[in-house]
UniProtKB/Swiss-Prot annotation:
<dbReference type="InterPro" id="IPR003177">
    <property type="entry name" value="Cytc_oxidase_su7a_met"/>
</dbReference>
<keyword id="KW-0007">Acetylation</keyword>
<dbReference type="GO" id="GO:0005739">
    <property type="term" value="C:mitochondrion"/>
</dbReference>
<dbReference type="GO" id="GO:0005743">
    <property type="term" value="C:mitochondrial inner membrane"/>
</dbReference>
<keyword id="KW-0472">Membrane</keyword>
<feature type="transmembrane region" description="Helical">
    <location>
        <begin position="82"/>
        <end position="107"/>
    </location>
</feature>
<keyword id="KW-0809">Transit peptide</keyword>
<dbReference type="GO" id="GO:0002082">
    <property type="term" value="P:regulation of oxidative phosphorylation"/>
</dbReference>
<feature type="transit peptide" description="Mitochondrion">
    <location>
        <begin position="1"/>
        <end position="55"/>
    </location>
</feature>
<dbReference type="GO" id="GO:0045277">
    <property type="term" value="C:respiratory chain complex IV"/>
</dbReference>
<keyword id="KW-0496">Mitochondrion</keyword>
<keyword id="KW-1133">Transmembrane helix</keyword>
<dbReference type="GO" id="GO:0098803">
    <property type="term" value="C:respiratory chain complex"/>
</dbReference>
<protein>
    <recommendedName>
        <fullName>Cytochrome c oxidase subunit 7A2-like, mitochondrial</fullName>
    </recommendedName>
</protein>
<dbReference type="Pfam" id="PF02238">
    <property type="entry name" value="COX7a"/>
</dbReference>
<dbReference type="InterPro" id="IPR017267">
    <property type="entry name" value="Cyt_c_oxidase_su7a-rel_mt"/>
</dbReference>
<keyword id="KW-0999">Mitochondrion inner membrane</keyword>
Amino acid sequence: MYYKFSGFTQKLAGAWASDAYSPQGLRPVVSTEAPPIIFATPTKLSSGPTAYDYAGKNTVPELQKFFQKSDGVPIHLKRGLPDQMLYRTTMALTVGGTIYCLIALYMASQPRNK
């Protein structure tokens, strides 16, 4: 005997094998026909600009030459003032955050006076 959960009575009820194996009215789809082809006619490709045309100029070779020059300047400071400001800001925030964490750990380790 096969059982199926009845949504109406909220109990198990006797059912046929096909109902028990396909719950809630879901039936396996048996289709003998293939779905219609969406693009049955050949599509015409556009003769517009290719991906390379609107991607812009390839600047990688110039940047490689610029960053590989041996002029004694570290790689993270090669572009001048903006790189220096970014580096100094990052280092200041890192040192400040480290000091803040150490102070917070020190304060958390001390017992409170009552």
